[in-house]
């Protein structure tokens, strides 16, 4: 897929970027690829990655997706883009919604415009379950980001830049997520702070997140949205699983929901399920390719579609305590923390 091609990863020093590079290095894909450009604004993280990976095929570009000129110049000669740069912390975005808009919406506009301008072959835009039925600023900004990508995809002719979207559930042990928080609390002998015990979240590994993006990259058509089917757990079961794994007796304290949190998350809305393709491990939601000339639909009508149940962390496969423990023990992060416990 990547032979003699140049790939750019925006926000490439984050959890996803590190997971992709780990996959490429272990699988040997890095040997076939021409160049991987890491585009991000944190010079310290770039330097850490440069030293840790020490691979001549990695090229580092300091810049911000909010600045069109910096992303446009860095994208010259790029064949493919994985757009992972984002503000993703829900409470932070609640307090600074314009910052979420500037990065997640306007920043994405810059990335997509630069990709089209530089005749990039395909762009995969990384979104989130919080973009479905959004109630918080982060989810709203990501929902608008998706709409922006699909609108641009709708205007592309055959042979032009292909724009696809992937939606994640909760990526376990990613930066700023709850698993590192619980493990730190366990190690420090503190109470485990749970917002709401019955709250459910999808459980997706960083390996799964890379699989999803590569699947979309290989199979995606213009304007497609891809979702990976994932199991879920309540937050209380997740905390108890970590207690068992680390042989912890820490107390659990319920603190109530944080700003902008939902009781459960949705990956596919009921309206989207009506047109989604079930691809066994994934759902593909095709783009609505209709234009603004709706007259023909009033005259000819439109076939009726069944309203299906949405795909949520409440109605997906629910893992019990032992299943969650088994899943957590597959994570490199958890294994490393156990070694250092």
Swiss-Prot record:
Report the EC number(s), separated by commas if there are several.
Answer: 5.1.3.2
Which reaction(s) does the protein catalyse, per the Swiss-Prot or TrEMBL entry? Answer: UDP-alpha-D-glucose = UDP-alpha-D-galactose
Which GO biological process annotations does it have? lipopolysaccharide biosynthetic process
Quote one Gene Ontology molecular function term: UDP-glucose 4-epimerase activity
Q: Note one Pfam family from the annotation.
A: Polysacc_synt_2
- Alphabetically list the UniProt keywords: Isomerase, Lipopolysaccharide biosynthesis
Q: Tell me the InterPro entries matching this sequence.
A: CapD_C, NAD(P)-bd_dom_sf, Polysac_CapD-like, Polysaccharide_Synthase-Rel
Gene3D superfamilies linked to this entry: NAD(P)-binding Rossmann-like Domain
Source domain of life: Bacteria
Tell me, in a sentence or two, what this protein's role is. Epimerizes UDP-galactose to UDP-glucose.
Family statement: Belongs to the polysaccharide synthase family.
What protein am I looking at?
UDP-glucose 4-epimerase
């Amino acid at each position: 897929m990547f032979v003699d091609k140049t790939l750019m990863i925006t926000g490439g020093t984050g959890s996803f970027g590190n997971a992709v590079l780990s996959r490429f290095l272990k699988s040997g894909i890095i040997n076939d690829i021409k160049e991987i450009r890491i585009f991000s604004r944190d010079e310290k993280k770039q330097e850490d990655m440069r030293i840790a990976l020490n691979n001549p095929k990695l090229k580092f570009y300091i810049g911000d997706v909010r600045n069109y000129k910096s992303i446009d110049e860095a994208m010259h000669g790029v064949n493919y883009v994985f757009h992972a740069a984002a503000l993703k912390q829900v409470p932070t975005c609640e307090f600074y919604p314009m910052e979420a808009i500037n990065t997640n919406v306007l920043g994405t506009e810059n990335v997509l415009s630069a990709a089209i301008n530089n005749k990039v072959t395909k762009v995969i835009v990384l979104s989130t379950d919080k973009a479905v039925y959004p109630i918080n600023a982060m989810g709203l900004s990501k929902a608008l980001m998706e709409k922006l990508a699909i609108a641009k995809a709708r205007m592309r002719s055959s042979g032009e830049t292909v724009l696809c979207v992937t939606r994640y559930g909760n990526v376990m042990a990613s930066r700023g997520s709850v698993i590192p928080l619980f493990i730190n609390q366990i190690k420090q002998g503190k109470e485990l702070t749970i917002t709401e015990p019955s709250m459910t979240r999808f459980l997706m590994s960083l390996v799964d997140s890379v699989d999803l993006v590569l699947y979309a990259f290989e199979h995606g058509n213009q304007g497609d949205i891809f979702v990976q089917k994932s199991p879920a757990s309540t937050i209380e079961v997740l905390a108890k699983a970590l207690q068992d794994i680390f042989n912890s007796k820490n107390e659990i304290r319920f603190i109530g929901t944080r700003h902008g949190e939902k009781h459960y998350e949705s990956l596919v809305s009921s309206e989207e399920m009506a047109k989604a393709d079930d691809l066994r491990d994934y759902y593909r939601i095709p783009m609505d390719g209709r234009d603004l000339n709706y007259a023909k639909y009033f005259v000819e009508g439109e076939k009726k579609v069944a309203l299906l149940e949405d795909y949520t962390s409440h109605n997906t496969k629910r893992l019990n305590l032992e299943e969650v423990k088994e899943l957590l023990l597959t994570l490199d992060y958890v294994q490393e923390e156990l070694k250092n416990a």
